[in-house]
Swiss-Prot record:
Residues 143-152 have a biased composition (Basic residues). Keywords: Coiled coil, Disease variant, DNA damage, DNA recombination, DNA repair, DNA-binding, Fanconi anemia, Nucleus, Phosphoprotein, Repeat, Tumor suppressor, WD repeat. WD repeats lie at residues 854-915, 917-961, 962-1009, 1010-1052, 1058-1109, 1115-1153, 1155-1186. This is Partner and localizer of BRCA2.
């Protein structure tokens, strides 16, 4: 703010400068803090990088003597125990460990043709996961003292023999670094080995392994093309003798900083380990268990897998031992089992002895797996990738994370459905998929609700196998170990989107900060699977593009690129095979992109299935049953004002029902997205999402042609609600208007459904301004010439009242609800008609004829004041504890309060006189009794005064509320008064709040726009919003709670200085009724008096909906008027009062001048059925409008 030199600053200017300075200081502090954080992060990153390089050098130096050491290669000692320790969260101290108890067996590589070759590639120093030494442990490598101290923090105890510290895993290009330390207390035991690099496989230890392991991109390890394909699980199950020569699947282990990634490497078919005691061990995917601190140990001969469950129960370590598959389950030993689990395993093992083969056991475990997982999915499923399993026996598509082909799970689904009821699928997904990795956070929440179905089916089978549950009721034991948690998978841009062979496991509390919900499914009445069985292996993807490449010998390697695709936008959805996904409790917290209507045809098109379909002879009835269950289960519409949850009749799919109009407004604001209509509603046709998405502009049809039951594009799987009717109508899809009969028919039809008494809710207990109007007929009325004014059309037009409600009709509700619904439906019809005609704005006038309307004079008030009458209003005034409807009349020098004695007699209660400044208008303040405000001035408002009566002596009082150059003033609900004053440089927008009795007030200032405000308008349906029209034909909107200026929206320049009379909010749109005092008369369109426009506040795009013009033969322009609910009244320059029904879009009544005197002002009373019209001589006429 530039001031001339030497001019002192005022206090206000000093305060403003102080505020600006404080703001700048805050911003500077924030910026400085960000910069400091960035610098610290860079330093830490550099330090870590340097430390890693130093450790690599030390590791290389420590490993070089080992490789040069001569040692016999004909005997290798496999250590007694191989312990893998995983440090999860430093804050919670959670730990999980896996211990492999492999007996101190020695296998002679001489059994193979060429002994045990040690494979090296480039600079790879060694492929052994542990050092080669004699059993006595004579070879000991001394480590620097600094390294020893560092390693001590990663060991569990010195009693454990071999520790793999995954916290210290380091991936270092093509090199494999390894460090060892031998326990001084147990020199006879095997040396302790700590792996600090990317673990390569055990392939180098296997005989007959001529091909080296190739490492690609540090993330995925591929078998050379000459390798034999790995045999699938079915092959393992059907081999009679496999304990002598079993394939050892290879593993690689890495650490990404937030989770473990286990990457499976198929071995060569010729690589066999000839040992009698070492069973087939196969690590597949991490699994999530919860056992309240318990331990579960399964031992097969000398194979021990000890799962140390953490406090929270999350165990993101390798599970799913195929030893349970590849050997008879009755060979289980219980030597090392905890006491609390030994008994359960023994009992379960007895039930399993009745099974004929391990394959039967596996079938029993995985029976209801796929069905239960699909049932438990609260969100859409996201495809990750596929892996080549059973390539030798079948050519199948295996989704990423599945241990077996989808055919296997479908086949085993039926036999297990009787025993497996409650499935903790979400708990399994929690540990597998992680919730939010570093870098994702909440960046792309719109897709974070898509669950990546990576290893769910595998996890279920793993849990059943490890707990030896076989289709008996004893499966509850293992089920109790599972916790149901809400899962969201990262879907945003990632540093490494190659998720082809990764199973992401995350410890709880590391980076997951979201809420956890429990979604147990009742055991007695399950819903049918929500997806057809034939498409169980196919899941929807939303943000990923899958590209596949086939290698030799049917080796398939799939990479999931992190590219965004819009399948749900581009592919049309069919309703015949749609399946509804149950919603979680927090499904409405944020706008998320979900696809809840999955089409079988659409899903099949997402994947290229290679020669695999479920055989109809085995699965035909099952497929038909599932498809039928999906198609015959429509979603019930929501009931009005019902909160909580409601179950579907057929099952237990739970849908939250609490929806607020505010949330609906938020979700429906962005109308540029596609609108997808749920089936089962009254829509004959849904919008074409593909064609709408390709449009670049925003036409009136897109902006307003919102179907009656629609959902936002980011909430596709949620059914819309038939909520309690909001303040402004929901746009329907009724046909375009035809002749006048169509209007009447549509109006009658809507009215017949609701048939409401035309009055507002907060005034429904009020009494009429006059007593029963039936007692006044034309013969007994002193005002006979204009007692009944049948304007035009049929005089016997029936009105909708409570007596005409047919049986079974709900009780009357607020009239503005159904009438404004009519208005919006008619608006939508008008838009649809204009859309067909390809017009951008609705500039067509209303119908030429006048719809029948009835104005009946019910009372007349004669004001004896000699000055000119300027305004009139109706309000309640409390006297002797009783609130009575009264009329306030304003002349230039006096304001009077009138009470009705009977229909034609009025008593003056109070009078306030003004000698200095004349009265311009009355400003009623809703919800305030015994107080009325008036605006004083000559041509512009100079003062605002509050008029009331003293409670002591009943004398009239007046208080100055505001003075100055006041541009606009309006009374708002909740006892508020808003005013705008000052010039552009010092403009103030102030809101005053009164007490209920009128005493005391609070002031609040709103952020002023840079334009002069002409009028204010309250937004019906959103009490905390305020509109204002400016001199530049802009509409501004404020938040009354915060005082913030939210948006400035420009409207059409066709009419200058438009005045906003009323605004309605619905579905994120603003419907605004404008008047055009400066509009020129046009013979083609006649004189536009009112106009209905709609604005999208988010995009600031506006479009004209309807023009309300005079009927033929009438002339004049708008002078002043009033809008109440669905009725608008205006005084024309010709002296006539015209009334429009905003629902019908027509002029419904004309009131010519009475006694050759023009009408001066017109106001609607507290109910929309009474009209107050005044003349300059002080006469006030009360009409009943119907």
């Amino acid at each position: 703010m530039d001031e001339p030199p030497g001019k002192p600053l005022s206090c206000e200017e000093k305060e403003k400068l102080k505020e600006k300075l404080a703001f700048l200081k805050r911003e500077y502090s924030k910026t400085l803090a960000r910069l400091q954080r960035a610098q610290r992060a860079e330093k830490i990153k550099h330090s870590i990088k340097k430390t890693v390089e130093e450790q690599d050098c030390l590791s290389q130096q420590d490993l070089s003597p080992q490789l040069k050491h001569s040692e016999p290669k004909n005997k290798i000692c496999v250590y007694d125990k191989l312990h893998i320790k995983t440090h999860l969260d430093e804050e919670t101290g959670e730990k999980t460990s896996i211990t492999l108890d492999v007996g101190p067996e020695s296998f002679n590589p001489g059994d193979g043709p060429g002994g045990l070759p040690i494979q090296r590639t480039d600079d790879t120093q060694e492929h052994f996961p542990h050092r080669v030494s004699d059993p006595s442990g004579e070879q000991k490598q001394k480590l620097p003292s600094r390294r020893k101290k560092q390693q001590k923090r990663t060991f569990i105890s010195q009693e454990r023999d071999c520790v793999f510290g995954t916290d210290s895993l380091r991936l270092s290009g093509k090199r494999l670094k390894e460090q060892e330390e031998i326990s001084s207390k147990n020199p006879a035991r095997s040396p302790v080995t700590e792996i600090r690099t990317h673990l390569l496989s055990l392939k180098s230890e296997l005989p007959d392994s001529p091909e080296p392991v190739t490492e690609i991109n540090e993330d995925s390890v591929l078998i050379p093309p000459t390798a034999q394909p790995e045999k699938g699980v079915d092959t393992f199950l059907r081999r009679p003798n496999f304990t002598r020569a079993t394939t050892v699947p290879l593993q690689t282990l890495s650490d990404s900083g937030s989770s473990q990634h286990l990457e499976h490497i198929p071995p060569k078919g010729s690589s066999e380990l000839t040992t009698h005691d070492l069973k087939n061990i196969r690590f597949t995917s991490p699994v999530s268990l919860e056992a309240q601190g318990k331990k579960m140990t399964v031992s097969t001969d000398n194979l021990l897998v000890n799962k140390a469950i953490s406090k929270s129960g999350q165990l993101p370590t390798s599970s799913n031992l195929e030893a349970n598959i590849s050997c008879s389950l009755n060979e289980l030993t219980y030597n090392n089992l905890p006491a609390n689990e030994n008994q359960n395993l023994k009992e379960q093992n007895q039930t399993e002895k009745s099974l004929k083969s391990p394959s039967d056991t596996l079938d029993g475990r995985n029976e209801n797996l796929q069905e239960s997982e699909i049932l438990s999915q609260p969100k859409s499923l996201s495809l990750e990738a596929t892996s080549p399993l059973s390539a030798e026996k079948h050519s199948c598509t295996v989704p990423e994370g599945l241990l077996f082909p989808a055919e296997y799970y479908v086949r085993t689904t039926r036999s297990m459905s009787n025993c497996q009821r409650k499935v903790a699928v979400e708990a399994v997904i929690q540990s597998h998929l992680d919730v939010k990795k570093k870098g994702f956070k909440n960046k792309n929440k719109d897709a974070s609700k898509n669950l990546n179905l990576s290893n769910e089916e595998t996890d279920q089978s793993e849990i059943r196998m490890s707990g030896t549950c076989t289709g008996q009721p004893s499966s509850r034991t293992s089920q109790k170990l599972l916790s149901l948690t809400k899962v969201s998978s990262p879907a945003g841009p990632t540093e490494d989107n190659d998720l082809s062979r990764k199973a992401v496991a995350q410890a709880p509390g590391r980076r997951y900060t979201g809420k956890r919900k429990s979604a147990c499914t009742p055991a007695s009445d399950h819903c049918e699977p929500l997806l057809p069985t034939s498409s169980l292996s196919i899941v929807n993807r939303s943000k990923e593009e899958v590209t596949s490449h086939k290698y030799q010998h049917e080796k398939l390697f799939i990479q999931v690129k992190g590219k965004k695709s819009r399948h749900q936008k581009e592919d049309s959805l069919s309703w015949s095979n749609s399946a509804y996904l149950s919603l979680d409790d927090d499904a409405f917290t944020a706008p998320f992109h979900r696809d809840g209507m999955l089409s079988l045809k659409q899903l099949l098109s997402f994947l290229s299935i290679t020669d695999f379909q479920l055989p109809d002879e085995d699965f035909g009835p099952l497929k038909l049953e599932k498809v039928k269950s999906c198609s015959e289960k429509p979603v019930e519409p929501f009931e009005s004002k019902m909160f909580g949850e409601r179950h579907l009749k057929e099952g237990s799919c739970i849908f939250p029902e609490e929806l607020s109009p505010k949330r609906m407004d938020t979700e429906m604001e962005d109308l540029e997205e596609d609108l997808i209509v749920l089936p089962g509603k009254s829509h004959p046709k849904r919008p074409n999402s593909q064609s709408q998405h390709t449009k670049t502009g925003l036409s009136s049809s897109i902006l307003l042609y919102t179907p009656l039951n629609t959902v936002a594009p980011d909430d596709n799987d949620r059914p819309t609600t038939d909520m309690c009717s909001p303040a402004f109508p929901i746009l329907g899809t009724t046909p375009a208007f035809g002749p006048q009969g169509s209007y009447e028919k549509a109006s009658t039809e809507v009215a017949g459904r609701t048939c409401c008494t035309p009055q507002l809710a907060h005034l429904k207990d009020s009494v009429c301004l006059a007593s029963d109007t039936k007692q006044f007929d034309s013969s007994g009325s002193p005002a006979k010439p204009h007692t009944t004014l049948q304007v035009s059309g049929r005089q016997g037009q029936p009105t909708c009242d409570c007596d005409s409600v047919p049986p079974g009709t709900p009780p009357p509700i607020e009239s503005f609800t159904f009438k404004e619904n009519q208005l919006c439906r008619n608006t939508c019809q008008e838009l649809h008609k204009h859309s067909v005609e390809q017009t951008e704005t609705a500039e067509l006038p209303a119908s030429d004829s006048i719809n029948p309307g009835n104005l009946q004079l019910v009372s007349e008030l004669k004001n004896p004041s000699g000055s000119c009458s300027v305004d009139v209003s109706a309000m309640f005034w409390e006297r002797a504890g009783c609130k009575e409807p009264c009329i306030i009349t304003a002349c230039e020098d006096v304001v009077s309060l009138w009470k009705a004695l009977d229909a034609w007699q009025w008593e003056k209660l109070y009078t306030w006189h003004f000698a200095e400044v004349p009265v311009l208008q009355i400003v009623p303040v809703p919800d305030v009794y015994n107080l009325v405000c008036v605006a004083l001035g000559n041509l512009e408002i100079r003062e605002i005064r509050a008029l009331f009566c003293s409670s002591d002596d009943e004398s009239e009082k007046q208080v100055l509320l505001k003075s100055g150059n006041i541009k606009a003033v309006l009374g708002l609900t909740k006892r508020r008064l808003v005013s705008s004053s000052g010039t552009l440089s010092d403009q103030q927008v102030e809101v005053m709040t009164f007490a209920e009795d009128g005493g005391g007030k609070e002031n609040q200032f709103l952020m002023p726009p840079e334009e002069t405000i002409l009028t204010f308008a309250e937004v019906q349906g959103m009490q905390e919003a305020l509109l204002g029209t400016t001199i530049m034909n802009n509409i501004v909107i404020w938040n009354l709670k915060t005082g913030q200026l939210l948006k400035k929206m420009h409207i059409d320049d066709s009419y200058q200085a438009s005045v906003c009379h009323k605004a309605y909010s619905e579905m994120g749109l603003l419907f605004i009724v404008l008047s055009h005092p400066c509009a020129k008369e046009s013979e083609s369109l006649r004189s536009p008096v009112f106009q209905l426009i709609v604005i999208n506040p988010k995009t600031t795009l506006s479009v004209g909906v309807m023009l309300y013009c005079l009927p033929p033969g009438q002339a004049g322009r708008f002078l002043e008027g009033d809008v109440k609910d669905h009725c608008a009244a205006a005084i024309l320059t010709s002296g006539t009062i015209a009334i429009w029904d905003l629902l019908l879009g027509q002029c419904t009544a004309l009131l010519p001048p009475v006694s050759d005197q023009h009408w001066s002002f017109v106001k609607w009373s507290g109910t929309d059925s009474h009209l107050l019209a005044g003349q300059k001589d002080g006469n006030i006429f009360v009409y009943h409008y119907s």
